[in-house]
Amino acid sequence: MKTNFLVLLSALLAASSAVTATLIPAKCKHEAFSQRAGSSLNAAIKSDGRKYFGTCADPGTLGNWQISNIIKAEMGQVTPENSMKWDATQPQRGTFNFGNADRLVDFATSNGKLIRGHTLVWHSQLPSWVSSITDANDLTNVIQNRIATVVGRYKGKVYAWDVVNEMFNENGSFRESVFYKLLGEDFVKIAFEAARKADPNAKLYINDYNLDDPDYPKLKSLVANVKKWRSQGVPIDGIGSQSHLQAAGHFLDASKVGGAMQALCAAASECAMTELDIAQASPDQYTKATEACLNQKNCVGITVWGVSDNTSWRKNANPLLWNSSYQKKPAYNAVLSTLNSYQA
């Protein structure tokens, strides 16, 4: 009797499930799947046809289990905040140190994350032995050797490289770095050609900050020069807008970033927001920034510059999506909602 009852109960449950499944329209099933697929920032942006939503990190921050768990759950891409910069990888001439960079790459690859290499040629965090070079041929060889060594080491593991970083002044002129002083703008060609040779499949970016207003001289100059260099055969694939934005109502807030991204993305094969953070993390400002990327079909992804406010380089501005207790802020919900509801 007990066996017959169990058989009957199983049959009733199976029938009930079948009826329920029949009554759920296909659209509802699809919506339920979409909501599950977009339950993280990375899943949501990929459902919009983009490549990644990411953040920056280094072995030190990855040692914080709360941050590493958030990255594993929410992010699809990692940028080394400092561990691939020149002072970290080649503090003395002829001596390379890849300990921290290797650890970052190992974390990313073992957890299925894309990597944006950052950065190859930059005037800051530059060892004194480089900044004191006075011979153009010597500097050319040094640039080529660094790029061949660093990019070559991670060939096939890095999605994109910030090849040249922050080379423009606010008025649009070229920054008077050691690279420009000795080589003029030819250092751009030298760097990008070396990177292409070292890893032909990596996407190569020029990256800068304060590119958040389409009428700003810095943005106009970068766009004009990228178009010129690309027409001359310099292998620039993408433009990275760091997107360190101010609070609403301040100069270079998110109010004009839509037009800025339109101008930047039109000048290259692809573009990205590479270091996004917004002072005070207004949900509305984060929504505007997110939409600015999504509105450009070749904007491949968004990288926020850190996970939690306590680890931000702008920590006093509380600019990130998680607070110092690793709790999601309203800005997080705004970004996720924007990604999930976006329609091209």
Curated annotation (Swiss-Prot):
Superkingdom: Eukaryota
Disulfide bonds: C293-C299
Enzyme Commission code: 3.2.1.8
Catalytic activities: Endohydrolysis of (1->4)-beta-D-xylosidic linkages in xylans
GO biological process, one term: xylan catabolic process
Molecular functions (GO terms): endo-1,4-beta-xylanase activity
Top enzyme class: hydrolase
Location of the GH10 domain: 35-338
Pfam families per record: Glyco_hydro_10
Subcellular location: Secreted
Active site as annotated: E166 (proton donor), E275 (nucleophile)
Keywords linked to the UniProt accession: Carbohydrate metabolism, Disulfide bond, Glycoprotein, Glycosidase, Hydrolase, Polysaccharide degradation, Secreted, Signal, Xylan degradation
Annotated glycan sites: N171, N310, N323
Pathway assignment: Glycan degradation; xylan degradation
Signal peptide: 1-21
Record-level GO cellular component terms: extracellular region
InterPro entries the UniProt entry points to: GH10 (IPR044846), GH10_dom (IPR001000), Glycoside_hydrolase_SF (IPR017853)
Induction summary: Induced in presence of Zea mays leaves and by xylan, and repressed by glucose. SNF1 acts as a positive regulator through the release of glucose repression.
Chief subcellular location: secreted
Biological function: Endo-1,4-beta-xylanase involved in the hydrolysis of xylan, a major structural heterogeneous polysaccharide found in plant biomass representing the second most abundant polysaccharide in the biosphere, after cellulose.
Family recorded in the similarity comment: Belongs to the glycosyl hydrolase 10 (cellulase F) family.
Name listed for the protein in its UniProt record: Endo-1,4-beta-xylanase UM03411
Provenance organism: Mycosarcoma maydis
